[in-house]
C-alpha cells in the first residue's frame, strides 16, 4: 500500500530510521515492486506507463545508492516539473526499473536463457522479441508440427524466440537457419543455440546467386 499523504511526516521519520538500520529503503511503498516478478505481463494501461526521470524526494542508502521517491496527489504525479495523470492512490512510491530476469519472465523466456552481452543489449532484445508463450500457442495449432523432424528458417531471428517457442512445444528441430544482422542478437543466439546456421542479411535473397551460394555453405 502507498504511504498515506496525511501521515507523511511520521512515515518520513520512520523511513530515516529504517534506512539507518537496514541500509536501504524497503520496497513496500511500491505496489508494483513488492515481490520479484515471476509471471507473465498483465495488460498495462497508458496511465501506468511512468518513467523514473524525476523525483520529489531522494533517499541515499548506506552504500551511497540514491533512491527516488515519487509523490502521487489527487491522481497526478510530477515528472521533470510537469504533472501527469496516473491511476494510483495518493501517497509516496518507489518506482524502479525491471531487472533483465524479470523482463525475461514477462516475455515468458526461460530463466536459463543466457545473455552474454550487456544488460542494455539484453533489454533491447527482449523488447524487440516475441512473447514466447503466445507464439507457442499459435504454433501449437500447426498440423503435424511435432509428428516429424522439421527444418526451420527464421527471418529476422533476433534472439531466437521462435526456437524457444518450438522447444517449449517439444519440436524436433533438425536444422535451424536464421537471418539476422545485429551482432549482439547473433552472439546471444549462438551462445544459447550454437548449432544455429546464420545466413546473414535477409535482403540477400534478392541476389540471384544467394540460394545456391548459401546452400553450398551450409551443406
Report each predicted region and the residues it spans:
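Class I SAM-dependent DNA methyltransferase catalytic core
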Residues: 1-153, 168-169, 181-184, 215-216
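Core alpha/beta nucleotide-donor-binding catalytic domains of modification enzymes
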Residues: 148-219
Amino acid at each position: 500500500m502507498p504511504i498515506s499523504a496525511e501521515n507523511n511526516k511520521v512515515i518520513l521519520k520512520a523511513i530515516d530510521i529504517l534506512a539507518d538500520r537496514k541500509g536501504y529503503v524497503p520496497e513496500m511503498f511500491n505496489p508494483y515492486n513488492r515481490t520479484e516478478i515471476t509471471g507473465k505481463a498483465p495488460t498495462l494501461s497508458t496511465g501506468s506507463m511512468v518513467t523514473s526521470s524525476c523525483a520529489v524526494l531522494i533517499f541515499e542508502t548506506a552504500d551511497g545508492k540514491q533512491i527516488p521517491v515519487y509523490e502521487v496527489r489527487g491522481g497526478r504525479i510530477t515528472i521533470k516539473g510537469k504533472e501527469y495523470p496516473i491511476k494510483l492512490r495518493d501517497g509516496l512510491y518507489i518506482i524502479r526499473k525491471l531487472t533483465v530476469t524479470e523482463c525475461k519472465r514477462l516475455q515468458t523466456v526461460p530463466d536459463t536463457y543466457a545473455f552474454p552481452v550487456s544488460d542494455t543489449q539484453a533489454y533491447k532484445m527482449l523488447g524487440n522479441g516475441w512473447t514466447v508463450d503466445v507464439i507457442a500457442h499459435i504454433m501449437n495449432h500447426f498440423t503435424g508440427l511435432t509428428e516429424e523432424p522439421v527444418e526451420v528458417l527464421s527471418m529476422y531471428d533476433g534472439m531466437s524466440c521462435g526456437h524457444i517457442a518450438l522447444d517449449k512445444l517439444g519440436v524436433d528441430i533438425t536444422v535451424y537457419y536464421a537471418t539476422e544482422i545485429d551482432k549482439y542478437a547473433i552472439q546471444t543466439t549462438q551462445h544459447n543455440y550454437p548449432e544455429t546456421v546464420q545466413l546473414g542479411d535477409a535482403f540477400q535473397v534478392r541476389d540471384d546467386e544467394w540460394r545456391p551460394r548459401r546452400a553450398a555453405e551450409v551443406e
